[in-house]
Amino acid sequence: MRQYVIIGNGAAGVTAAEELRRRDARANITVVSDEKYPMYSRPGLAYILIHEVSVEQSLARKPDWYTQHRIELITSRAEKIDFERRTVQLANGRGLLYDALLIAVGATAVKAPFPGGHLDGIVYLDNLDNTLEILQRAKTARSAVVVGGGITALEMAEGLAHHKVETHYLVRKNNLWSALLNDQESKLVEKQILHHGVNIHYGHETSEICGDNGRVTALKTNKGEVIPCDVVGVAIGVKPNLALAKGTSLEVDRGILTDEFLQTNIPDVYAAGDCAQIYDAWSGEKRVDSLWPTAIASGRIAAQNMSGLKQPYRKGVPFNAALLFGLHLTAIGQVAAAGRDDTDAEELSFISRGASEVWTSTAGAGYTSAWADDGTSSQRLIVRDNVIVGALLLGNQRLADPLRDLIERRINVERVKKQLMSGGTAMSVAVMDTWTRLKREGKV
């Protein structure tokens, strides 16, 4: 009887456990988690903040699901892996033997690197406990400052403002999420943020978090502005959890390196989800993602290979959809507003939760983009070599599914490229007509 151990109870780990049970009815399957909850939806944390969903509704698996599938869930921290003896040592003193091991430990929010980063009142939207802490603090907080440039920072700002906390949002550059949004898109998002009562401070960076008696009292910016606050929300990115690799022969870079079968350099040891650095055919490099669909897909393929298949992982097009201040956002494929350059180096040091390194990999010759904007919605396409390689939609989502299909299948759009590149209504019509024709022909 095979012994499978999975470290991590998130999307990758639970998907793997489910797939292993489907493929092997008799195996012993153990999932190790350092959180007290069954699997929950990390993308759903933002909706808990604004009371769109309850904690109960955010649970992707109920406690009895593990029992029904004969999967042992151990709530303890994995402290050490002995790859030679094939054992995992837990903080509760228990040791687990494995025939095949999956490391799916995810990624963790980067802690505040500023002076005062240790003070009480600094919060992160990184897990369920963090989310509940923000909700608790919002009951008494008068003012908050949010620092960060991605989806999570915007979600945190929206959540605090929703609870009537005076909220300030620091933006390092002169437009929002500059690694992804162009100026027009930034203005569209800005309009929604201001409508929700959030104060935006462009060109400001955190110089120091000030405190008294160990608690946050203010934030000082690089321009000398002091913003009184009770809470500082930090969302400057996430980094893969690599502690288990320290002092071992497990090969890591930004994440745990895997081959095309999601196996690490150590036999029968696999990695999946946010902690894994996986080959990406879109860029030709090994990339890190912090995307829910990627975690699910990689967890499933890892499980198949753990059970004896030789199934290569073919990473799909990076995709994420979010609702920010009432504005729907969808990012598909390579969507950077501009190529990666030295000025973005700091911003790209850590990937944002819900983002992909592929999004910002559009640097280089041969890329053209088209734009459509009606004042409340926008669509932007990025084309290279007669193939749409990326799209970013704000507001109206009518083109989301068609564009995802066209990008995923790398459809040649040369016959409608002129209409696509003209932007506006002609661009939207060309996308929909092309997709409709291909559906009729059974090609998408």
Q: How would you describe each model-predicted region?
A:
Residues 2-3, 22, 275-397:
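Mid-to-C-terminal Rossmann-like scaffold of FAD/NAD(P)H-dependent oxidoreductases
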